[in-house]
């Protein structure tokens, strides 16, 4: 089910004339980058996964084809509750290829938040890890299906353990053919719904168009003089704006590398920084503080 968006006509005209907004979608930018640098590493994570732009594009195309086969249409919401894994980017790209709206969720959310958010955004498909932090997130949602009015499928992201009670992401990718042609989406259409953390009430969904995200991340890269040679480290949750926009989206807009970390510790962060020769990192103040403290404690 698509969402009708209303724009301030004068502001939209100004943004388009200024070059902030255009007709292109995030998917258009992804395809351009994947064609330009197919063999370049697009994303890695701390579990050793590494995908080139070409390989990631192929896997996302297979998942996109499956989404369409399950009745997903442009504007439908697809939710995924994943930590900093390469699979997060893969699912996001599959949504871009089909015109589905990405709804990334925080891994820390439990039953109450999940039921609220999934019903609020009317998500049709939900992805969650089979195992993460000694929990089984995908099994958490299965008993709640009768409370989720719009949900049709639950997919287990079987990165750390096999999927025993749900569809498995790896099997979907293995058994699906690549999508023959991505669905064309206009820049003014809805791209993602990011939910607030809900510290003062239930989480609230913030609707972002392709143009919203593109204007933000092009400005971010330009202001920091980031290029295709940069390597972005993202220790923040990908369900937050910082992780979703700066850690996953911005890198592929410019053909850079995204380095993801699922559980932040200063030691793990410093290890990835050195291993991947990262040049850029974004995070909240506590992340930076802990990182600097760890550096100070290292032997000279």
Language model regions located:
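ANL superfamily adenylate-forming
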Residues: 7-9, 132-187, 294-297
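Conserved AMP-binding/adenylate-forming core of the ANL superfamily
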Residues: 22-23, 31, 39-85, 89-93, ...
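Conserved pre-ATP/AMP-binding loop-to-beta segment of ANL
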Residues: 38-39, 156-161, 174-195, 202, ...
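Conserved AMP-binding A3 loop
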Residues: 50-54, 191-215
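A short helix-loop-beta submotif of the ANL/AMP-binding
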Residues: 65, 77, 83-103, 107-111, ...
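Conserved helix-loop-beta element of the AMP-binding
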Residues: 122-125, 144-155, 232-233, 279-283, ...
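Conserved AMP-binding/adenylation subdomain of ANL enzymes
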Residues: 214-231, 239-280, 286-298
């Amino acid at each position: 089910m698509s969402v009708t968006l209303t724009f301030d006509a004068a502001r939209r005209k100004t943004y388009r004339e200024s070059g902030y907004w255009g007709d292109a979608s995030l998917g258009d930018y992804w395809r351009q980058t994947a064609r330009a640098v197919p063999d370049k590493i697009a994303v890695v994570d701390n579990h050793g996964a590494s995908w080139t732009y070409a390989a990631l594009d192929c896997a996302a195309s297979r998942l996109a084809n499956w989404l369409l086969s399950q009745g997903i249409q442009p504007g439908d919401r697809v939710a995924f509750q994943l930590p900093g894994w390469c699979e997060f980017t893969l699912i996001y790209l599959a949504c871009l290829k089909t015109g589905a709206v990405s709804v990334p969720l925080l891994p820390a959310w439990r039953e109450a938040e999940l039921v609220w958010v999934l019903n609020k955004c009317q998500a049709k498909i939900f992805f969650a890890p089979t195992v993460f932090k000694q929990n089984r997130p995908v099994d958490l949602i299965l008993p709640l299906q009768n409370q989720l009015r719009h949900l049709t499928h639950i997919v287990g992201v079987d990165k750390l353990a096999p999927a025993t009670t749900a569809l498995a992401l790896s099997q979907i990718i293995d058994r699906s053919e690549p999508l023959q042609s991505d669905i064309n989406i206009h820049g003014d259409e809805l791209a993602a719904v990011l939910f607030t953390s809900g510290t003062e009430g239930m989480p609230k969904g913030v609707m972002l168009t392709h143009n919203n995200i593109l204007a933000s991340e092009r400005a971010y890269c330009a202001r920091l003089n980031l290029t295709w040679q940069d390597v972005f480290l993202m220790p923040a949750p990908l369900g937050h704006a910082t992780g979703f926009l700066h850690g996953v989206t911005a890198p592929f807009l410019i053909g850079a590398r995204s380095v993801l970390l699922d559980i932040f510790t200063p030691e793990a962060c410093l290890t990835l920084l050195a291993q991947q020769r990262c040049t850029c990192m974004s995070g909240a103040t506590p992340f930076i503080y802990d990182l600097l403290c760890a550096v100070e404690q290292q032997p000279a």
